[in-house]
Amino acid sequence: MPAAAPDIRVRRIYEPPSPDDGVRVLVDRLWPRGLARTDARIDEWPKALTPSTQLRRWYHGPDGAYEEFCRRYEDELSAPAAAEALDRLRGLAAQGTVTLLTAAKDPSAGHTSVLVRALSETQA
């Protein structure tokens, strides 16, 4: 019988924590503006899984294209530190709900969609 798909959710960090969140993981490189660390209630902040500063600046610059951003971010996720952090989150997701938290206005777009896809893939 195939394993159940992991329960990976994406929410804005500015939303109040929910009892259904499970493990709360901040997936932004920078701390969210205007949010006290005590209010965030995060369990993990794996900066190795966040887009690099260079990639983030490129994407928000005049030449940034979403498809190319996704490709470059996927490349970054194959780095050893990122791969180790992905494996850790996959393990947590196998045990229960993992909620990825971002300050982005549209939490289902941007790097979180790439990260959800990477976390949902089984390791070969």
Predicted regions and their residues:
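Residues lining hydrophobic/aromatic ligand-binding pockets adjacent to catalytic sites
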Residues: 1-124
